[in-house]
């Protein structure tokens, strides 16, 4: 599979690649994800990461 300019998956022309129907990417609002405090701890492979909303309204992920 490869991306086109419209960022949709398209099958490769190579016969060695299987064509799979792409599943939609899940979408969630940052407000729902971060909650009223604007912070979320993510556990990834035993490591903790903090995702938070900055005062400027941007998202910041730190270890």
Curated annotation (Swiss-Prot):
Residues 1-32 are annotated as: Disordered. It holds the Pfam family hemP. Transmembrane segments: none annotated. InterPro entries: Hemin_uptake_protein_HemP (IPR019600). Residues 1-17 have a biased composition (Basic and acidic residues). Gene3D superfamilies: Complement Module, domain 1 (2.10.70.10). Residues 18-32 have a biased composition (Polar residues). Signal peptide: none annotated. GO terms for molecular function: protein homodimerization activity. To Y.enterocolitica HemP. This is Uncharacterized protein YdiE. It comes from Escherichia coli (strain K12). The gene is ydiE.
């Amino acid at each position: 599979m490869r991306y086109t300019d419209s960022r949709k998956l398209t099958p490769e022309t190579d016969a060695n690649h299987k064509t799979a129907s792409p599943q939609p990417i899940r979408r969630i609002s940052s407000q729902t994800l971060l909650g009223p405090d604007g912070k979320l701890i993510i556990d990834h492979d035993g490591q903790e990461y903090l995702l938070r909303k900055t005062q400027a309204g941007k998202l910041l992920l730190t270890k």
